[in-house]
Amino acid sequence: MITFIDDNKDVYTVESICSELPIAVSTYYAAKSRPPSQRQVEDEVLLAEVVRVHAENYGVYGRRKIHAQMNREGFEIGRDRCERLMKQAGIAGVVRGKKPRTTVADEKAERAPDLVDRAWETVREPNRVWVADFTYVRTWAAMVYVAFVIDVYSRRIVGWRVSTNMKADLVLDALEHAIWVRDTELDGLICHSDAGAQYTSIRHTERLGEIGAAPSIGSLGDPIDNAVAESTIGLYKTELINPKRPWRTVDQVEFATFEYVDWFNHRRLHAAIGNRPPVEHETLFYNQQTAPETGPNTNVRALH
């Protein structure tokens, strides 16, 4: 009630507001003259930090992720308090929409079997399973297509490419980028995608064979079969593309995607990997592999 009076006293007098509310003018001034409580002081500090965390992360974090990031930074704040301060600041997370359909299958192309079978949770190390997909972005200059390659273990975007067409070169360039980024032996890797013609093309299949990787194709028209890629593209559209429309040029989309991927990999918290950024999750994995063993090795490779 005190806050309401403060918010409106520039328009109406304190006396006129109090006459309409169950509060005496003397009570209002007495409350204003009291020093702030410890909790109020803490709220002021935490409110500024909540706003900062929200702004530093594309303005997309909701209560859960702001709460998680605040705790990572050493702030003691509960979820309810975090939600209350977000409401006070007038900020909220974004709501993800549906990914538009871009897949056009080649009915004549031979399709690899589904080697993953939606068993995402059994991938227990990097470079065991990659998933691939692409989406489109409307610009004033042209339609733009953006392809991604994602490591299922860490949710890291390991390769991406922007193009003005959706021919096989688009997904091949994204694959080449991923191979370059990883810079390691990839023998035994599974590269999973939907049944789009770009992914069932001979060139794409042959390139996977050259690096010792096996293609894996989900069923036609079922997005759950490529859920990790679908989720990543959904985040990309919801967190970057849709809020910043209209897009003017191809270069604008490419530069913004570059910045987004850097944030996505190094700073964005992912619930599926313990509210860590992908690069941090991979670093933790490799550190555990080089640490002295204290017991039986329980790191079983589930998909290989």
Language model feature labels by segment:
Residues 1-304:
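Charged DNA-binding/catalytic regions of mobile-element recombinases
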